Amino acid sequence: MEAFEISDFKEHAKKKSMWAGALNKVTISGLMGVFTEDEDLMALPIHRDHCPALLKIFDEIIVNATDHERACHSKTKKVTYIKISFNKGVFSCENDGPGIPIAKHEQASLIAKRDVYVPEVASCHFLAGTNINKAKDCIKGGTNGVGLKLAMVHSQWAILTTADGAQKYVQHINQRLDIIEPPTITPSREMFTRIELMPVYQELGYAEPLSETEQADLSAWIYLRACQCAAYVGKGTTIYYNEKPCRTGSVMALAKMYTLLSAPNGTIHTATIKADAKPYSLHPLQVAAVVSPKFKKFEHVSIINGVNCVKGEHVTFLKKTINEIVVKKFQQTIKDKNRKTTLRDSCSNIFIVIVGSIPGIEWTGQRKDELSIAENVFKTHYSIPSSFLTSMTKSIVDILLQSISKKDNHKQVDVDKYTRARNAGGKRAQDCMLLAAEGDSALSLLRTGLTLGKSNPSGPSFDFCGMISLGGVIMNACKKVTNITTDSGETIMVRNEQLTNNKVLQGIVQVLGLDFNCHYKTQEERAKLRYGCIVACVDQDLDGCGKILGLLLAYFHLFWPQLIIHGFVKRLLTPLIRVYEKGKTVPVEFYYEQEFDAWAKKQTSLANHTVKYYKGLAAHDTHEVKSMFKHFDNMVYTFTLDDSAKELFHIYFGGESELRKRELCTGVVPLTETQTQSIHSVRRIPCSLHLQVDTKAYKLDAIERQIPNFLDGMTRARRKILAGGVKCFASNNRERKVFQFGGYVADHMFYHHGDMSLNTSIIKAAQYYPGSSHLYPVFIGIGSFGSRHLGGKDAGSPRYISVQLASEFIKTMFPAEDSWLLPYVFEDGQRAEPEYYVPVLPLAIMEYGANPSEGWKYTTWARQLEDILALVRAYVDKNNPKHELLHYAIKHKITILPLRPSNYNFKGHLKRFGQYYYSYGTYVISEQRNIITITELPLRVPTVAYIESIKKSSNRMTFIEEIIDYSSSETIEILVKLKPNSLNRIMEEFKCTEEQDSIENFLRLRNCLHSHLNFVKPKGGIIEFNTYYEILYAWLPYRRELYQKRLMREHAVLKLRIIMETAIVRYINESAELNLSHYEDEKEASRILSEHGFPPLNQTLIISPEFASIEELNQKALQGCYTYILSLQARELLIAAKTRRVEKIKKMQARLDKVEQLLQESPFPGASVWLEEIDAVEKAIIKGRNTQWKFH
């Protein structure tokens, strides 16, 4: 009986609202109930106001019953049922199992001066009962000993009935505890407890008797509590409501009941959360998480220790754990560092039901429905099953991704440089077109054309044409999305933050009224758009057609392929070439270079024609724009989506670089005349054709700007710089400012990618410091061109530093005779730089380089000059003792002779381990001073970058007190001052291996010379080499063939010049006899010369053959006239002049004989010439190195 102590706390009966809550009707947030008894139970919201104190009365009695069930759970006599009923305002709760002990309570009897029994104390005396002082492992929901008393104090009448197996106790309590009738005690073998009561409804704000709605609401709420209890007590105990068993005997059933209305298709995940230590391990928690996009905020139902608690640390623990997993999974899935998800986001689509017992908790809040326990209890002892978290997280992330997609669909941005068509978005919206201009200059052209309406009423105008700028570049949307397959099999395309915030693309979406969730398959869907089509207005160059237009097409294909299918995406095809014939005002226009080439071949001469190129829209002047816009509709071409387009979009713009690399290994197949005619006849362009021609051409051009050709080791920019330098400095090799020379290159070599990048390339081409890319720079730098200290980034401004051609090296490495034989790039119809050079030595393996492009990585480490010279000489010289050995190696694709990395200007060491070489820096240790002095760094490691990398290494800096850099641009002197007693510890922690000692390991004084030998091929595309030998072997035939071509061409030119000089000498001898001065005109004179067997010759071609091929020389040189004779002056007919010509003929004949001899020499024509040129290059390099590449 000691458990039922009584407290003298009489005032509690007066302060009735202290624990029960408000004593009148109020709005209770989240109040729910079960109104029907259908097969599928459903919790519905209760919208009417109710009294918290009344609900507390019912709740306290129900919690007492579940407490009793838990207390008897492990005893022989268990609680097998709890019967709850509510009828006509009367509430009843009964449970079997041991009843309340029926015994006299001495203390209470003494105070009351009558016989008082334990059941009366438990139900009628405040702060009395078993819940006043609970043990730490207690899992009862009751607290403070006031629960049942609240019910009694707020009841008109109540009947307490309990039986303990020996006696049955019945007691009536009336008038809110004012009248407590003596109990009736009778013998009985039953065991149960039942509480029946009629609350004081009227005083709590209700009708008396209850109205139908009040009865219905209260019954629904009590039914809900009964269902909650069913989940709490589990299968061993049956909960009845109004004589019918509740069907929510599990946490999943309870979760379904709560979410059947709001999220009938929600995904339910269940788990048992266990603890690792007593008393918590004795009471695992059951959890069900319903995940659905229908939920907009986190909600939970917690039945802990039988109490429906509204908040608690257990919920906080669950939310935080879920959030951590969801955030991690979300980031892994979306692969977008800029996308963040918050705790609110990660849990907003979850409804969690938690059921179970937690020992030692406290109840706070006015109604004692807020769970309180130290949060670290959950962190320390409870663990949530990973399978539950994984499956639930997958569902949550799927919903988050879907919500992001929908949310981003309505993202608004400020649309710059947009002019709306007057009829856009109106009844005639489908007649409007949005002109998407590449940039500001294109907008200016469009504005000029669209404002011609007054003079050209039938042309386009702002009535039906809007304008928007593409800003000169478009984001590749294909690489900014993540495709995710949800549990239901649906594929969600999630745009990353960069894409959704992209002002250009988002501006197009807003202006057109596009919806990412609409496919636009039907006319009804397309009719909702603000424009009937979009027309791309881009330059006719690779950047415009190949890149910008390709990316715009890819964007529409990615999100709205149906719009391309239905002809929504178009382009303005402007003339690329106009030919103005002298005396005519209307030009002949060509839209493709192939069309012009075909036309030009049919013309006898273009002497009276002016050919103008228009790669940029800004190149068209006003009168040409007016002409274009008169026929505007004829220039609008529609894109079509053919079968192969989908794959090609993926190849060129997707993330799989291997597919793109396979495609870009080959060059572009130009459009045929038939294809261009077909395009013009229907004004339709298949997307696949655009991708295979324009986009591929752009990609290959981009590669050539970033990866060198294996024949000359140069990118396109460096080749333009060299060609421009040879031309610019040909007559006078005086120094020029970098920015001035850059302007010359841009002008004469047609460089279109900005002066900043061009000037940077010029500076790099003149850099000659230890570790620079070029061991053999093509320019001599005057001024500060950067140093090893900052890896060349400390070069002076292009306005202040100057260059001049390294002519002694250039003239020997790139013989002038070769320039007439190389293929050339033509820009706007004019010859620019060679497509590639073929230097005397393989420059591609003589210099350093590194750059990525389109999935390829290019990395080379210069090879030893002596090894290269030995290999090339052995290949050329048949008398070389290694000649046959090398040819055998080439034939069988093996390596015999060495080809080591270059150690020029490097004071460190090179070592080979396995298939790779490694470079090592050097150091000196002063144990007395506790200092390591670094005297050389690994190859191509800039000083400042090296020091920063060491400082960022925390495990190294623990041993370092200070790093001092005394290095110059030529030498390395870095002092590493160690902390006391650090040297031995360094030796222990940074182990010495075969490949590096402890200090080399500690100070990172080693790097691997790993190569990626990917180069551009002569006819475009990429070739992948495995070894430097392969590059050499591939280069050799090109250089060898060049000597044969050079000699054959010289042979043809010499023969023609001998023919011409011989004819002139003959004419001098016969001039008196012919006496051409007596004839009236050239025609007569030419006839006489022809009759006397003088050959008609093309004097200009023979004297200056320049780029003419042997075929052209043989065809055109003998199809000339007699100007070479008729233009002779009198002094050229003198004997002395004739004598000089005869001597000239002899010299030419001697040279011709020599050329014929060279053509016949072994092992191939011109071998001896090559050897001579190798010697000349070597001599120039030695001089360059001896003079720091100044050559003086």
Curated annotation (Swiss-Prot):
Regions annotated as coiled coil: none
Subcellular location: Host cytoplasm
UniProt: ATP binding residues: N64, N95, G142, T143, N144, G145, V146, G147, L148, K149
Keyword annotations of the record: ATP-binding, DNA-binding, Early protein, Host cytoplasm, Isomerase, Late protein, Magnesium, Metal-binding, Nucleotide-binding, Topoisomerase
Induction details: Expressed in the early phase of the viral replicative cycle.
Domain of life of the native organism: Viruses
Amino-acid positions noted as binding Mg(2+) 1 in the UniProt annotation, renumbered to this chain: E438, D539
List of catalytic residues: Y800 (o-(5'-phospho-dna)-tyrosine intermediate)
EC number: 5.6.2.2
BP-aspect Gene Ontology terms: DNA topological change; sister chromatid segregation
Cofactor(s) listed in the protein's UniProt record: Mg(2+); Mn(2+); Ca(2+)
Keyword Nucleotide-binding: yes
Catalyzed chemical reaction(s): ATP-dependent breakage, passage and rejoining of double-stranded DNA
UniProt family annotation: Belongs to the type II topoisomerase family.
UniProt-recorded name of the protein: DNA topoisomerase 2
Protein's organism: African swine fever virus (isolate Warthog/Namibia/Wart80/1980) (ASFV)
